[in-house]
Structure formats: C-alpha cells, structure tokens
C-alpha cells in the first residue's frame, strides 16, 4: 500500500476516528511520539541536547567499552526526520565527528571503517553548512577537528585537511588582508597602509 492509498483511506475517517488513530500511533510508536512531541512543543534545543547525548553515548557508553558508530549515525538520522533547523543538524553532525576524534585521541588509532564513517559525516556536515550558508558559523570547530587529527593514522588527517581546504578555500581568501610587496627586499604593505 502506498502513500496515496493511505491518504485516500484517511480522508474517509471522521475527525474523532482520525484522532483515535493518531493517539494509538503516539502510544505504540516511539518515533511517532517524538515527532508529535516536537510538532506540538518544538523546543529544538532540548531535542538537540537529547540527540547529542545519544551521539556521545555511541562513543562513550555508560557500560562497557564498545563504541557503536551505528547508534551515533542513527541518532543523526532520527534527529533529521523530526525536521529541526539545518543549523542544529549541522551542529549534531559536526559533534559526531568531534566526538569520534576525541575518542581516537583518548584510546588510540581504531580502524579504517571508523575513520571512513567520520570522514563521510564531516563531508556531509560541511556540505550542509555550505548549502545553508553556515560555514562561517562553524569555521572554528571545523578547523579544530582537522588540527585535533594530527598524528592519527589511516590518512585520516590528510583527508580531513583536504576536505576542509576545499570548503574553506574561499572563506580564507575573503578574510585575509591583501599583502603586496613593492619590490624584492622592499617594504611589505599591509592592507591600505
């Protein structure tokens, strides 16, 4: 049964039956409950913090020492489905990468698939930031991720550094003061001095 069929059947229901159906879904399905909780009371920051905690626990579980990247990625995916602002989605994605980098620095090199997951999320986060004109807002954190990966294996640092350069090349060109050298060995003029 497709969405068109569902819509056709829902249109046949009267208001009370529709309310009962939604209430039943609300009780039985956790993701529906979260969606309607967000829809009715859209406190994005509170919801963001909840999913941020889920991402953190994927790397640093309360019990045991086994990280679960899948849980962290699922938290990001579930958060996106609720329809929060792009700003908070980008923030959560970047937090995933930051936490993964911290985990590596705390416990040593992991494996290639671990770094691949972080790389993919970093690229997705920066892509979203560019699309939504958020690169400036997250510039310091995006740079810190790269600097914090220095010395990490599997070509991880080099890859993130290249990605960062690709996304922030225009950004750094726009913010640098123009420097002109009058002649070789001459005085360097900064800005319009």
List where the protein language model places each region:
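Charged linear interaction tracts used for macromolecular binding and regulation
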Residues: 59-138
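Eukaryote-biased recognition of C-terminal alpha-helical segments
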Residues: 120-193
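Short, structured coil/loop segments at alpha-helix boundaries
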Residues: 3-5, 29, 85-86, 107, ...
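N-terminal interaction modules that seed assembly of large macromolecular complexes
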Residues: 2-66
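Residues that form generic nucleotide/phosphate-binding pockets
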Residues: 9, 35, 39, 54, ...
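Residue-level signal for alpha-helical context at structural boundaries
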Residues: 28, 36-40, 54, 73, ...
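Residue-level signal for secondary-structure boundary elements
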Residues: 18-21, 30-34, 44, 48, ...
């Amino acid at each position: 049964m497709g969405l068109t069929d569902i819509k056709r059947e829902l249109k046949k229901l009267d208001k009370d039956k529709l309310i009962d159906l939604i209430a039943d879904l609300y009780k039985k399905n956790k993701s529906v409950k979260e969606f309607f909780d967000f829809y009715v009371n859209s406190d994005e920051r509170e919801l963001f913090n909840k999913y941020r905690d889920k991402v953190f626990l994927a790397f640093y579980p309360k019990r045991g020492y086994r990280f679960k990247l899948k849980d962290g990625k699922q938290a990001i995916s579930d958060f996106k489905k609720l329809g929060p602002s792009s700003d908070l989605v980008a923030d959560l994605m970047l937090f995933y990468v930051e936490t993964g980098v911290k985990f590596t620095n705390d416990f040593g090199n992991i494996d290639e698939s671990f770094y691949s997951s972080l790389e993919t999320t970093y690229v997705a986060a920066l892509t979203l930031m560019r699309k939504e004109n958020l690169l400036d807002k997250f510039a310091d954190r995006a740079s810190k991720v790269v600097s914090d990966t220095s010395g990490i294996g599997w070509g991880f640092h080099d890859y993130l550094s290249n990605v960062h350069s690709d996304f922030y090349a225009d950004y750094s060109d726009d913010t640098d003061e123009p420097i002109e050298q009058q002649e070789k060995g001459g005085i360097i003029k900064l800005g319009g001095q």
